[in-house]
Amino acid sequence: MRTLLSRSTELARRQFFHSSAFKSLSRRSRAMKHAPQPWFPIAASSVVDGTSARDCLVSFGADPESVEAMLERHPEVREYDAATEIAPRMSYLQFLEGRGELGDETAAECALRQPGILERKYETVFECPSRGYIAVNKPFAVRLDTPRGWLETDGDGNRVEKTRFTPRWEGDASCEDWLNATFPDKHHRFCHQLDTATSGIVLTASTKKAAGEAAKLFRERKAKKTYLAVVFGWPEEDEWTVNAKLGKDHDDPKGFRERVDEENGKPSETSFKVVQRGYCTLDGANRGVKVTRMRCKPITGRRHQIRLHLKHSGHPILGDMAYSDDGDSYRMFLHALELVMPFADEELRFATPPPASFEHVLSAEAP
């Protein structure tokens, strides 16, 4: 079995994102049979190359002294890229502030209180042209793909592109957009789903053959996933399995949520194992509450399966706004840690280290 650990492509990524070619590019169309898809810049073009984390935050209205104090407490933020991480995240927070979704806080105050929200780093975990696969470490709060447009004929008989998506803030881009920018010569097919709120391993195929081989493994439940989660409370057991059936929550007006439905739901199974019990260190409403870091292994692959099975166990995920009462944590603490693909000729294991945020969010003693 080959183990493929995360390797950073940070230098090449920054060189590309800060190039004049990248900043002048507004969209990219494929010369393929399907309609061209819209493509949006991932970096914030308003941020000058080389801008520090401090100066970027100040430019978004953060108090300079408060920024310095935050950086003393969270020195890792100094390493975040201003153009591709901090500025897009701040634009996103300003978007939420404009919609009244940050309560009494401003975007700058929210970022300074829980600066982990500013992290948005992509990494290429594995690239194998001969097999036709690319594995990526996706940031949290980034959707998997961008809704594609279509071609229509205008009054002059010309084929013109109609888009289904308009970016809502500077840097409002998907994992697909990043893949298209980083690997512009490939067509990317996602081999599985990963929730927008979840970070971690995403496997893509660049050929139909590769996509078919991966789909077969997922269909036959031979592909194995491992997730890392931080949940509310201290489970009594160190290990347990949940078999609750899952189905659509027809009472949800937005049609987003699923629910436990033992009568009409689909069979679902997830195993859980406690890694560490401790206390939440996030500034805010959850500071000091009991939380647990744990590994989760879904046997089946239902939508929101891990999230629902943890809620069903009495331990919803920290930051899961759909299945917990937590509207204060800056992210949902669920990360796709590992993916094992047992192909006919060899078994490949794609893995990433646990995110730093998963270490910082929990302490052995109450803060």
Give the predicted meaning of each segment:
Residues 172-175, 179, 208, 286-343:
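Pseudouridine synthase
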Residues 85-103:
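Long, compositionally biased
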